[in-house]
Amino acid sequence: MTDQLYLSLWLNRHSRATRLRHFEQLLKLFPFSQRDQPQSTVSIHAIDSTQPPLLEQALNGPLDPEAIAPILRDYQGDDIAYSIESWWDLWQFGDSDPKLAPARVTLSCFGPDFDDGLASGHEDLRMDFGVDTNFLPQPEVPGSAKFIESNVKSLLRLVHQMESALPVAHRKLETESGENFADRLQQLLKATIA
């Protein structure tokens, strides 16, 4: 069963007031794909995700965090959420041989009052890496182990880089169903080796 994979980051309490600056820093650190890719999208919502976006803008070519920052700064408030849907490079398996290609990623920043934020324990920053199968062993695909290992290393390197660069109080890498991704990965690795 495929599931969405997320990294949720909660900033130190005193850093929440500058969350947009930290989101811009996250964007500068993120390894966006430089390959040919579909459009990226920047979206800004107020109050909650059921409301129409205040802004939704398509962007062509590789994402440039420096070009996005002024757009984000035009919309500020505790009930604002910023979302960037873009691409990063992962090994992927289609009908042919594995290939390094752009994979969808969504990077988000949530104001403390967005979607009843703090009351619901909402994270400050989130990275949605798409389906977890890009990071899990695929025994039915011969030779996939080294490519999956490369994807997992890229993911872990990114997690540690974000933790080092941002004032993170707490982080959680999990699937949409709430399953702990590290536990699931470990179980599948044991089953693959056995």
What are these regions (language model features)?
Residues 32-111:
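Short, intrinsically disordered low-complexity segments
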Residues 26-33, 78, 158-161, 165, ...:
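Conserved short hydrophobic interaction patches
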Residues 19, 54-68, 179-194:
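Polar/charged, Gly/Pro-rich intrinsically disordered segments
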Residues 5-11, 56-59, 69-73, 125-141:
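Short, hydrophobic beta-strand segments
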Residues 14-21, 63, 146, 150-153, ...:
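Alpha-helix boundary/N-cap detector
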Residues 102-103, 108-127:
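Amphipathic N-proximal alpha-helical interface segments
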Residues 1-52:
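Short, extreme N-terminal segment that most often corresponds to the first beta-strand
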Residues 120-194:
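Acidic, proline/glycine-rich low-complexity IDRs
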